[in-house]
Amino acid sequence: MKFVYNEEKNEEMRHILMMQPTVEEAEALLKKDDTDGYAWYVYGTALSLVGKNEEAIEAHSHGIAFDPFYAPNYFGRGRRDNAVGRHWQAIADFTVAIHLDSDNWTYWYYRATTLNLHGHVEESIDDFKQCMHLSEASEHYPLIHWIYTSYVELGKFDEARKCLDLIDATVEAPQMDYGYCRAVRLYKGMIKPEDYIDIPTMKKAVLPREKRVELELNGMYYGLYCYWTLHGEPEKAAQAIRDLQKVAYPGAFGYTKSIPIAKKLGIIKE
């Protein structure tokens, strides 16, 4: 089956991903129509933003009951399932979202990251590559980062190098992808390792959210680890993992990927 890039759909998903509703705002939507799937999605998102993941899962489930063909509630429930450690349930929900809306690359992306973080690295690469067909050039930075680091993890260094040809890294990245963009430009040799991390510049460039610099650094240091691994510099790779642990952001993809490596290196004690 051939999937088609849809700019309008991608813009809608950017809105869904970036929204930060309050619980009060979401409750107001539900008062207008408590059978509206979108209103339940907003409510679930609002609950998750205040740390109420189980309640958020219930909210998305209510939305699914009222509108079982509204894909964002499966997506939202999958994200919250991930947050509480129910990864197979998350994969199942992302898969349903994909079946309902197969041209939406965000659903493929979240299934890919979940597969990857739980040991199904080879399978995740297929989903990341599917995302490439469904997204525009400016959105390719996180995808190439994941494909590159996945190949490095699998020891397939030639494939890691080749995947860098799939992206034009001169294209401007969205603000939310600052770290991914820096990482890909490092992999391609456009940035020197010593210039890779510049905290003062980062503070001005990343999304203006609490702990955003630390979040970006977790992914960037993991990318640096993979870069030095591919280039045959194990000591420098290990130092990247040590530096990552100093800014550890639990839940960040880069931090999660670093844990088994840090344990193997003795940086994190069993």
Annotate each predicted stretch with a short phrase:
Residues 39, 73, 107, 141-143:
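TPR alpha-solenoid repeat register
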Residues 36, 69-70, 103-104, 138-140, ...:
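Residue-level recognition of tetratricopeptide repeat
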